[in-house]
Amino acid sequence: LVTGVVYPLTRALFGQRLRQPLGREVVVSRGLAERLLADGAWRSDPSSATADLWVIAKAAAHDTRIAQVYLGPRTRPPPQPADVSQAVARVLGTVFQDMALHAPRWQRVRGSRPVPTFGEEHLPGEPNPPPAPGPLVSAFGLGWQDLRALWGAVLPPQTMLALQRVPRDPPEAFRMPDAVWARVVYDFAVGWHMKIMDREQLLRSMTPLYLGWVASFVNEVGGLGRPETEARVERLCEAFEAEKPYLISRWRWPDRFTP
C-alpha cells in the first residue's frame, strides 16, 4: 500500500518525497506538537493505526520542515489475504480524509521536492519473496466480474475500457499502466469525497484493483535489484504528479467534468 498508493499519492498532494509516510516512528517539534494537540481530530481515535499518517499530513499541509531518517529494517509478517480489504479501507480512508481536510492546500502544490534524509539504508538480508501474480490477477478478474457495475459508478468510461483491455492470460503478462492506476486512485478519492455510496463499501471495492496493480508491479520488478526497483517507483510517482491536474478538475467539478 505504501509503494503503490500512499507514497505516490501523498507526494503528489503535498509535494514532499517522504518515502515511508507510514513509518510508525515520528518525532515532532514542540511547536508542531502544540498545533496537533490543539486539533481535536485525533481525540476521536487516538490509538488509530494510521495516526502517523495523520501527523505527517498535518505537517506537510502547513509547510512544516520534514526530514526522514533510516532506522534499519523492520521484520513484519506479510498481510494475510483476509486482511487486505480491511487494510485498504483503513489506510485509504485516512488518506482520503486528509485530502478533504487539506484540499485548499494541495490544489496549489505543483511537482515535488526531495526531503532531507539522514542515516544509511540497511537492507534486510533475506527479503520476503514476492507474491505469485496468478492469484492476484484472479482476484482482479473476479472483481471485474462482480464489481464492474460498482466501479462504473466511480470510474469514467475511458478508465473502465483501459482496465478491460489489460491482458490477464498469462498472469505474467498483466500490466496496469501508471497513468491508469493514478486515475483509478484519484477517482476513488473523489468518489469518497462526494459520498456517491457507502464509504466503507467504496473503499473495500477497491481491493481487487489494488491487487491487480500489485500483480503488475511484481511482474515488472521481479528479478530487479533495489536501485532498479526504486527507479520504477519513481516513474510511478511521476505519473501521479502528471495526472494531478485531472484530480483537481474532478475534485472541483465532479458533475460537469468529462474525462
PLM regions: where:
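Conserved nucleotide-sugar donor-binding catalytic segment
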Residues: G40-P46
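Active-site donor/metal-binding and catalytic loop motifs
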Residues: V69-S85, T94-L101, G111-P114
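Acceptor/aglycone-binding surface of glycosyltransferases and processive sugar-polymer synthases
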Residues: L1-L32
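Catalytic donor-sugar/metal-binding loop of nucleotide-sugar-dependent glycosyltransferases
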Residues: R43, W54-G72
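Conserved, well-folded catalytic cores of nucleic-acid-processing
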Residues: A12-Q16, D39, D98, H102
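Residues that scaffold the ATP/ADP-binding catalytic core of kinase and kinase-like folds
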Residues: R35-L36
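Acidic donor-binding loop at a coil-to-helix junction in glycosyltransferase catalytic cores
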Residues: P46-V55, A87
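Terminal low-complexity segments of carbohydrate-biosynthetic enzymes
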Residues: R90-P259
